[in-house]
Curated annotation (Swiss-Prot):
This is Transcription termination/antitermination protein NusG. The keyword Nucleotide-binding does not apply. GO terms for biological process: DNA-templated transcription termination; regulation of DNA-templated transcription elongation; transcription antitermination; transcription elongation-coupled chromatin remodeling. Participates in transcription elongation, termination and antitermination. Belongs to the NusG family. NCBIfam families: nusG (TIGR00922), NusG_myco (TIGR01956). The gene is nusG. Coiled coil: none annotated. Gene3D superfamilies: 2.30.30.30, NusG, N-terminal domain. It comes from the Bacteria. It comes from Halalkalibacterium halodurans (strain ATCC BAA-125 / DSM 18197 / FERM 7344 / JCM 9153 / C-125) (Bacillus halodurans). Residues 130-159 form the KOW domain.
Amino acid sequence: MEKNWYVVHTYSGYENKVKTNLEKRVESMDMTDKIFRVMVPVEEETEVKNGKSKQVSRKVFPGYVLVEMVMTDDSWYVVRNTPGVTGFVGSAGAGSKPTPLLPEEVDAILRQMGMQEERQVEIDFQLKESVKVKEGPFANFIGTIEEIQLDKRKLKVHVNMFGRETPVELEFTQIEKI
């Protein structure tokens, strides 16, 4: 049996309580080999009230908790009967096993929460290489790559404007090799 991520429906506002309850049940019922992670997806936002900014955590999916588990009768029973859980998302009726999330969906959620590195983009550009700008206000200008910022997916390119070298920040998709 392989482990997958499943979505559990809870009473709205009880997501963290369900997470705590389920983690305690997993420990007490010795299910650590079947139920691995319980997660309430949140994202950090900056909220401005009365001119003051404050960091707040906002639930991405209110009323839902993600559970990484191996689906067996026992693990299914433990999760379903946790206080606050109203059922699994994707089960077609009473007693039927739910459908797991697709790996791409899990990757997107974990990336959104900052828990997984975004897959690196392969770039085929080198410093001091001559390139042509494909789009934007500098379209058709020829320039030289001076800096590559992989984390931002941008490049600093010096283009010749009015007889002077001018630094321009561009995205990878805005340039092409010449």
